[in-house]
Amino acid sequence: MVESKFTIGDRTFTSRLIMGTGGAANLAILEEALIASGTELTTVAIRRVDTDGGSGLLKLLSRLDIMPLPNTAGCRSAAEAVLTAQLAREALNTNWIKLEVIADERTLLPDGLELVRAAEQLVDAGFVVLPYTNDDPALAHRLEGTGCAAVMPLGSPIGTGLGINNPHNIEIIVAQARVPVVLDAGIGTTSDAALAMELGCDAVLLASAVTRAVDPPTMAAAMASAVTAGYLARRAGRIPKRFWAQASSPELMRTGEELGN
């Protein structure tokens, strides 16, 4: 079996599926889904949880030995995101942050200018920064240049389930990146997750596709299998696409023709 571990910053992970927690009906279902996914890293919206010891979510992640990845979800400016990251570091004793700076509430698309400003400040402050970014190769490259530990381009807007709208751009981001690329947002079903890995992404981050599924634990297990399948397919190397058919057993075909003559 091909080795599947990958590294972000100073941490190495076995699972290439990163989970989010938003949209879960309750903690019991979320727990089943997290276990089924096999994830080792799960995002936490720092502005939406009680960090003073009363958060059932944080206790759940601790019990399951899953590393929490605080994010700056809901922030609209670099200043707001930096402050939220600082609060997360103090509350959770971690310098890891998933950086989100959105342009508006309707699309939840990243604000590239504010994102870069926040990334520069957080990297300078010693954070391991994982930015949620547009599927823009130039912006992803700029974020990598600031010192981000990974880049996390969207497949499509958060929660839409539209899959990967611009696979070519994702391939470009992967080709030029020297840090891990994590497909983040827009995953709707297993084929989307597998495609992300086939395009060369190092991991997939998803939440709604599991938490809002009819059967979240089963979907979580399916997503884990899809990520593994896509990763192995990428490593194995797909056959080139051809315009014309090509017999899979040419020698046998010729022998049959000779017998027919």
From Swiss-Prot:
Enzyme active site: K98
GO CC terms in record: cytoplasm
Catalysed reactions, semicolon-separated: [ThiS sulfur-carrier protein]-C-terminal-Gly-aminoethanethioate + 2-iminoacetate + 1-deoxy-D-xylulose 5-phosphate = [ThiS sulfur-carrier protein]-C-terminal Gly-Gly + 2-[(2R,5Z)-2-carboxy-4-methylthiazol-5(2H)-ylidene]ethyl phosphate + 2 H2O + H(+)
UniProt entry keywords in alphabetical sequence: Cytoplasm, Schiff base, Thiamine biosynthesis, Transferase
One GO BP annotation of this record: thiamine diphosphate biosynthetic process
Intracellular or extracellular location(s): Cytoplasm
EC number: 2.8.1.10
InterPro entries noted in UniProt: Aldolase_TIM (IPR013785), Thiazole_synthase_ThiG (IPR033983), ThiG (IPR008867)
Entry GO MF terms: thiazole synthase activity
Chief place where the protein resides: cytoplasm
Signal peptide: none
Annotated positions binding 1-deoxy-D-xylulose 5-phosphate: G159, A185, G186, A207, S208
Pathway: Cofactor biosynthesis; thiamine diphosphate biosynthesis
Nucleotide-binding keyword on record: no
Subunit structure of this chain's protein: Homotetramer. Forms heterodimers with either ThiH or ThiS.
Similarity field: Belongs to the ThiG family.
Task performed by this protein: Catalyzes the rearrangement of 1-deoxy-D-xylulose 5-phosphate (DXP) to produce the thiazole phosphate moiety of thiamine. Sulfur is provided by the thiocarboxylate moiety of the carrier protein ThiS. In vitro, sulfur can be provided by H(2)S.
Protein name: Thiazole synthase
